[in-house]
UniProtKB/Swiss-Prot annotation:
Signal peptide: none
Pfam families: UPF0223
Family: Belongs to the UPF0223 family.
Record protein name field: UPF0223 protein SSP1692
Domain of life according to the entry: Bacteria
Amino acid sequence: MEYQYPIDLDWSNDEMMQVVSFFNAVESYYESSVEGEKLLDRYKQFKKIVPGKAEEKQIFKEFENSSGYSSYHAVKAVQSSPDQKLFSAKSK
């Protein structure tokens, strides 16, 4: 799938890589499966870079508009079932 990740040019290279890593975990949730702990760890790193709720919503919306994948729903699915190890949108 061809699309661009929502990246802020003010972020450092390391921050950009961490944000992309989070979105890669979201992609795994929709395309195959992802470990819940891995997705939440990457989300925590994302939140260190994007602490504001409004900015998070904007970035999530940009990503969903370009990819079709809802970061919000992926994170909520994992948070709502803390005992489950693997998560996938395909197994719903």
